[in-house]
Curated annotation (Swiss-Prot):
Keywords: Signal. This is Non-structural protein 3a. It comes from Bat coronavirus HKU5 (BtCoV). It comes from the Viruses. Residues 1-39 form the signal peptide.
Amino acid sequence: MMSMRSRRSMFIEHFNELMMRVQRPPTLLLILLVANAFSKPIGTPMPEHCSTLVGREFQSCIRQAQFDTAGMYTNRVIVLDRARTHRYPIDRDTTTAHDTSYDTSDPQLLSDIGYSFDYGK
């Protein structure tokens, strides 16, 4: 039968061996994290409804989608009469008076109001 001392020394030896394995740097994981941090997306997201259009209609569709989603993830609001952006602090826990803070006019496509898509071509 093993003595208490030998069991303890075996446990300590096994524990030390296990700790040495844990302390090794996970090289592959570090390489993948660095590669992911410096990588670029393969393609840019494109609205599905724009995929069948070509030329200026395609450019207009993309610009319209960018215009429609301009303030979606930020606190920026596009003021249409001045074509400027303003930052409004929005407390998301409060209710807003929608009749005073939103434009109720009908939306128009950028291509319908003469938005230029000339990129020097």
